């Protein structure tokens, strides 16, 4: 309630193992995923929780959840574990996303939280091992598995514009995924992939994506992203990395490496320049301005590092 200044423990959480992700489609209703294929649900904005789904025998974590509204959503996890609900979690049904025999971990799923257009509310995305990028147009009923040309793991992703997502991976790998029309000209130097729906309402519809690598100046893995109020994207990563990506105006990436070098797991914007960073150092406010001033000031005792690279 006070932009992260104070925190209180939830009154009731009937689960003692690791929780991995949270999705709150409305003010009071929230869902969280965790180990033992567990899904928790809150009716009061996170004050109290109940176990809504659990499969201890599966012995694998659910890693991410995205609720499109108070009724429909998907939860994804290790070994291609995929669940979907259409009734607010009263029941969760197994979902088929990828026929890869390797059963890649599905690390993160997200939607169009910015609402560029109404139909985008039905769109969903996911990323995982083997550089896989997944797209759905019907709230997770049917998915396209799209090859990106990257063989590492993507840990997170975010929709940054209509038809575009940033995919965040291992060792500082960031990929811009751009949707093209079937007859649109695509520069020959881009990695491209086409996939077609085999069932459902969109059966036979095909999508063409092109992928660009974006160098942000770090080899640390990137863990989470969110949009600032002015359209820039803030990224968090291991080793104290925080980056702000400006793809519209300055076309650059400013990266701060905090002096404690402790890893960041999540980021929440607080306007244009400030954001909350959560990770090994706890939860605290941070700003790129403060990092830059520490770096250039001769009197500063901070060991923060700051650098800037251009987006080609």
Where are the model-predicted features located?
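Residue-level hotspots at or immediately adjacent to binding/recognition sites across diverse folds
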Residues: 1-312
């Amino acid at each position: 309630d006070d932009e992260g200044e104070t925190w209180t423990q939830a009154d009731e959480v009937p689960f003692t193992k690791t929780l991995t992700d949270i999705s709150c489609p409305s003010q009071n209703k929230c869902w969280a995923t965790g180990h033992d294929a567990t899904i928790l649900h809150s009716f009061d904005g996170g004050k109290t929780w109940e176990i809504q789904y659990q499969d201890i025998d599966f012995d694998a974590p659910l890693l991410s959840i995205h609720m499109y509204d108070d009724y429909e959503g998907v939860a994804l996890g290790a070994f291609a574990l995929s669940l979907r609900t259409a009734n607010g979690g009263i029941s969760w049904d197994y979902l088929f996303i990828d026929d890869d025999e390797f059963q890649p971990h599905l690390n993160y799923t997200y939607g169009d939280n910015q609402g560029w257009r109404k139909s985008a509310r039905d769109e969903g995305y996911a990323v995982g091992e083997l550089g896989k990028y997944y797209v759905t147009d019907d709230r997770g009923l049917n998915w396209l598995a799209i090859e990106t040309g990257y063989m590492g793991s993507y840990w997170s992703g975010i929709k940054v514009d209509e038809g575009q997502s940033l995919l965040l991976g291992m060792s500082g790998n960031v990929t811009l995924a751009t949707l093209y029309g079937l007859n649109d000209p695509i520069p020959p130097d881009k990695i491209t992939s086409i996939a077609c729906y085999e069932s459902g309402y969109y059966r036979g519809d095909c999508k063409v994506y092109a992928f660009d690598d974006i160098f942000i100046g770090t080899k640390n893995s990137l863990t989470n992203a969110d949009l600032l109020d002015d359209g820039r994207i803030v990224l968090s990563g291991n080793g104290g990395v925080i980056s702000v990506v400006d793809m519209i105006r300055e076309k650059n990436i400013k990266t701060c490496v905090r002096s404690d070098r402790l890893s960041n797991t999540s980021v929440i914007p607080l306007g244009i320049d400030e954001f909350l960073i959560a990770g090994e150092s706890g939860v605290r406010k941070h700003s790129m301005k403060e990092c830059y001033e520490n770096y250039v000031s001769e009197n500063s005792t901070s060991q923060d590092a700051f650098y800037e690279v251009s987006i080609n």
